[in-house]
Structure formats: structure tokens, C-alpha cells
């Protein structure tokens, strides 16, 4: 299992938490970005800066991630593409994307984009706060535990 991060939009505090969890669990972290980033100084972390272009980082992430991997992203359409590929997805505020909630999340994202385009709504999300970091840490721990159990179960079953 690998952890993928949509690095352009991920808060630094969330990236740091992912690295701590990855070190503890001996997992690889792949940070994918469309812009240069500072790579955390850990051997388990890889940084890929893709050529610029609309959705180039998203496309790379979707192409490279495999079923059973985890992606950290706040981009709802990207999460939808990953979920369809059986890659788990979690946003940096601790909210998990899954097949059950994806339709609602896409509809809400589209509604909010329309309201912003019409000038009826301002800005984006609130600043990343300590409660967001804590919610993310808790959700990340739960999700990694679940994914590891599922991977162990798959590995223990005889191949046909």
C-alpha cells in the first residue's frame, strides 16, 4: 500500500502527519504536484512534479495509484476518479470519500461552484485549524488500520 498526496492543495500540517504515520507503519508516500514543492527529508517520501497542464497532477495520480492505496486530496472530482479505481480517498480535514457519499459530494461541489460563479458566495474553505489537523490524524489512523487489515486479508487468501 502507498499513500498518495495531491500536494499542491494539501496543507503542510497534513503532509507532515502523513509522513509521521508512514514512517511508523513503514509505508511509501508519493507527493504529486504541478508546482515545485519542498520534499520532506524522509527516505519514505517521493516527490513527483509533473509537467504543467490542466489536471496533469490529477491524471498522474489516477494513473499510478493502485487499488488498496490511499490518496489524500480535497479535489472532489479527483476523489471520484480514485474511488472508481478502488483507491481510498481522504481529505486533509478528515472526511473520507467513498462510493456511498460521492454523488452527494459531487452535487454539493457543483452547487457551490455555480453559486461562486454567480457571485452569490465568496471564497473557499476556512483556514486549516488544529481541530482539522486532529480530525485528519484520527481519520488517517482509522483508515490506514482498515486498509492494512484488508491488505493482510487479501494476502492470506489462496490465489485461484
UniProtKB/Swiss-Prot annotation:
Record-annotated membrane-spanning stretches: none
Pfam families named among the record's database cross-references: DUF188
CDD domains: PIN_YqxD-like
Cross-referenced InterPro entries: UPF0178
Record-stated family: Belongs to the UPF0178 family.
Protein name: UPF0178 protein PA14_69280
Highest classification ranks of the organism: Bacteria, Pseudomonadati, Pseudomonadota, Gammaproteobacteria, Pseudomonadales
Amino acid at each position: 500500500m502507498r499513500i498518495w498526496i495531491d500536494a499542491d492543495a494539501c496543507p503542510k500540517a497534513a503532509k507532515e502527519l502523513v509522513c509521521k504515520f508512514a514512517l511508523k507503519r513503514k509505508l511509501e508516500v508519493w507527493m504529486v504536484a504541478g508546482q515545485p514543492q519542498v520534499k520532506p527529508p524522509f527516505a519514505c517520501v517521493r516527490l513527483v512534479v509533473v509537467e504543467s497542464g490542466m489536471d496533469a497532477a490529477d491524471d498522474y495520480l489516477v494513473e499510478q495509484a493502485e487499488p488498496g492505496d490511499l490518496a489524500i486530496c480535497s479535489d472532489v472530482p479527483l476523489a471520484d476518479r480514485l474511488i472508481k479505481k478502488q483507491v481510498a480517498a481522504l481529505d486533509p480535514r478528515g472526511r473520507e470519500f467513498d462510493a456511498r457519499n460521492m454523488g452527494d459530494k459531487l452535487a454539493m461541489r457543483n452547487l457551490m461552484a455555480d453559486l461562486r460563479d454567480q457571485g452569490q458566495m465568496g471564497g473557499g474553505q476556512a483556514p486549516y485549524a488544529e481541530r482539522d489537523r486532529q480530525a485528519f490524524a484520527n481519520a488517517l489512523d482509522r483508515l490506514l488500520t482498515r486498509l492494512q487489515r484488508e491488505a493482510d486479508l487479501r494476502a492470506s487468501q489462496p490465489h485461484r
